Structure formats: structure tokens, C-alpha cells
Amino acid sequence: MANKKRSASSSRWLQEHFSDKYVQQAQKKGLRSRAWFKLDEIQQSDKLFKPGMTVVDLGAAPGGWSQYVVTQIGGNGRIIACDILPMDPIVGVDFLQGDFRDELVLKALLERVGDSKVQVVMSDMAPNMSGTPAVDIPKSMYLVELALGMCRDVLAPGGSFLVKVFQGEGFDEYLREIRSLFTKVKIRKPDASRARSREVYIVATGRKL
């Protein structure tokens, strides 16, 4: 019975996925994922990326966000990306495959950043979802806390943080934590984000000294 339920749920998800207009547009444009459109909408409203910036991209695969940011920061910019999954190369992106929760992977990532600070840290990380919020939300909050920890390590004063968060237990506390570290914090729900999804994007700018 459980397998039948999962099969029906998976079929509905696939049907919804391939009928999604942003998935179809991404395929037509040769984009890596529909996440490209989410970031484009955020950039139009919040202007996070500028030529010459250095950006850290956490949870980067398959590369939709990195693919977009390359067009915004230009040839003098740099993206340092990390994901547990493999990602096909993108010109201008220094990709590290590994589990961000692993100390050795984190160390390697920090070494790639080097001594200079970055202007933007962005995270589209998400755990493997079970469909049970009581299980999924704590896993998600753990990942976004790690992303915020990366900000503390590498983000320059005045820098920006963009993070995908699933609303649920711990969300309000996390938001307060971010507000203590940044001068301006907004919550975005891009059109390309499915309406029934709990995901929202926190856009934090002006990292405090």
C-alpha cells in the first residue's frame, strides 16, 4: 500500500513538474534548472549581483544559479560553488563536489575562498525530502544554519546573503538571527516557486560589522 501511495505521489509530481511553464522555458532556453528564473526575479528586485563580485554558491547542482550569476558578475567575477552532487562545468565557476557538512569539504571550500572576503553567499540547499514536515524541516534548518555559518566566515562587511528556507518550526528564530547580522532583510516568494511549496527565500543585505 505504501509503495502504491508513493508511486501515485511520484506520478503527480512528475506530471506537475513537466507541465510547469518554468520547466518548459528552462528546457527551451537550454538552462540547467527552473531555479534560474527564481534568481532572475530576485535579482530584478534586489540587485544582489554586480560585475566583478566573488560569490559562494552552496547547493549549486545542477547549476541554475551559477549559470545565472555568471551573466551578472562578468569575466572579472568569480563563483565558488559546492554540492554533494556532481555538476557539469560552467566557465567562471570553481566547483567543489562534496558534502558541505563534512569538515574536510568545508576546509577545502574555505581554502578556495582564500583570505579575501566574498560579496555574496547564496544557498539553495535542501535535504532529501520525505514529505513529512516533522522530519524535513529540522534537516532543512540544519543546512541553512550551516549556510549562515559560512557567511560569518567569508562574507565581507556590507555583503549579501540569499538563502532558501522552508517555513516551519525554527523559521522565526532563524529570521531573527539573520536580522541581527544584516541591516536589511526581506522574504521573497518568486513566481517560479510553486505556490504549494513551503519554500521562501530570505534576502539579507548589508552585513553588519
UniProtKB/Swiss-Prot annotation:
Record-listed S-adenosyl-L-methionine binding positions: 63, 65, 83, 99, 124
Predominant location: cytoplasm
Enzyme class: transferase
Keyword terms of this UniProt record: Cytoplasm, Methyltransferase, rRNA processing, S-adenosyl-L-methionine, Transferase
Catalytic function, reaction form: uridine(2552) in 23S rRNA + S-adenosyl-L-methionine = 2'-O-methyluridine(2552) in 23S rRNA + S-adenosyl-L-homocysteine + H(+)
GO molecular function, a single term: rRNA (uridine-2'-O-)-methyltransferase activity
Active site (catalytic residues): 164 (proton acceptor)
A Pfam family that the UniProt record links to this protein: FtsJ
Subcellular localization, as worded in the UniProt entry: Cytoplasm
Enzyme Commission code(s) on record: 2.1.1.166
GO CC annotation, single: cytoplasm
HAMAP family: RNA_methyltr_E (MF_01547)
Biological function: Specifically methylates the uridine in position 2552 of 23S rRNA at the 2'-O position of the ribose in the fully assembled 50S ribosomal subunit.
Family per record: Belongs to the class I-like SAM-binding methyltransferase superfamily. RNA methyltransferase RlmE family.
Protein name as annotated: Ribosomal RNA large subunit methyltransferase E
Natural source organism: Pectobacterium carotovorum subsp. carotovorum (strain PC1)
Taxonomic path: Bacteria, Pseudomonadati, Pseudomonadota, Gammaproteobacteria, Enterobacterales
